Each structure stands twice: as structure tokens, then as C-alpha cells.
């Protein structure tokens, strides 16, 4: 049994910000402050006992047809490789919790290909908080030099969590954020995909060996060759690694072999 969380936007973001948000909605004439406050204070179940029970009950129906077949001639316009691998009959019409309902009407258990798309399951009820945020006009579009309060708060919470700091302990938080000691986790880079995260980590390592441009100081390990450890496959090669979507990371799993070999031959 999971311990259900039931929270509101106000619980997460604080009364001061919500107060400013409600007043801003009123100023725009979108809704009055009282209506906005009601939305902001609505407590949302993340994973209720009812949903947990349904999730458990559906397990026995995996692989069985539980709904009518959806038939369509629409094949899309993917590349030949994607089209060859595609399985329309297993494609989701909808989903719930740990399951998806295929076009063939069968119930499928969320598997490997969905693991990072649905970490909280399909139709996660906690996302109703996002619906409420949209109704209140909490903006998603922004830029690095105008990161909104929500983004800044989440960065702070991540640093606190990574360092075992209570949210209310502002003194310890300020000390960690100001630290320049090595191996202190006190910075957050906002990225939306796994590929970009891998690329960022890769560049952080390269920056210790090579200058990004002429304005940068000489790196700590200038003149040395960076070495990256990768996961071997069952054939003794490197094709078992994460594929990535950028050229350099793809070379880590044996792709672009001529490019990779040329880099190695030239000491890169």
C-alpha cells in the first residue's frame, strides 16, 4: 500500500506567491481573487486507495481483450526503420496507471519502452495540479534569465533534498548554496530530456580538458586525453550503451565508427 499524498498548489508554492498570483488574475480580469484562491487551495489526491485498488485488479487482465478493436488505415509518415518496427495494434488508445489499452483492445502492462515516459503511470491524478496551474496562468514559457518563482523554488527544494536539509532550515540552505567546495551538490540545470542531460554531463567533463571558446581559462586537465567508461555488450563491444541522440554520445556505443576512429587517431 502506498501512502497517498493530498496537496494543493498553495501547499507546494506558499501563500505569498499564491496571493500575488490571485491578485494578478484579478488585475488581468481573468477571474476574481476569491475564485483564483479556491482553485489554488484545492487539494488533489496523488494516488488514492481507489486508484491503487483498480491498478491491482487490472493486473489479471493483462494480455486479454477488454475493449472493442480500433481499426485505422492511418500509418503516419515515419522513417522506413521506424515503420518496420512499428506495432499499431499495440499502440495506445488510452491508458490507466501501469497499463495501456492497445488498438487491438488488449490490455498491456507498461514495459521497457514506456519506462521514462510514464514514471508515475498513465492518468496520474497529481497532474490535476498542472491543470489548476494552467487555469491560474502559471506560465511555462520562460527564459534562463527570467526563471519564474516556481522554477527557482523547485531548484532550491532539489538542493535541499540532495543535501538532507529541512525545507525550513534557511541557514543551512544558504550555506550549501554559497559553497564552492568540491563535490557539493548545489546547482541545478533545467533540461527536459534524457539526451540533453547526458549531453550536459558529457560537456561538463570535456570542459575539464578543452576550452569552450577563446575567452575561457586553460582547463585543469589541459593536454590530457579524457577517458569515458562505457557499458560493454555480450559480444565484448560497446553496443549495449544508451544510444543518445547527439553524435559524440552515439560514438560511445559504436555508431559513426569512421568519425570515432578519426578522433582517436588524432588524439581526441
Protein language model annotation of sequence segments:
Residues 2-23, 31, 92, 103, ...:
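PLP-dependent aspartate aminotransferase-fold enzymes
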Residues 8-20, 26-101, 108-109, 113-119, ...:
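Active-site-adjacent loop/helix segments that line or gate small-molecule/cofactor pockets in enzymes
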Residues 136-144, 183-188:
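Glycine- and acidic
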Residues 146-154, 193-198:
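Phosphate/oxyanion-binding active-site loops and adjacent basic polyanion-contact surfaces
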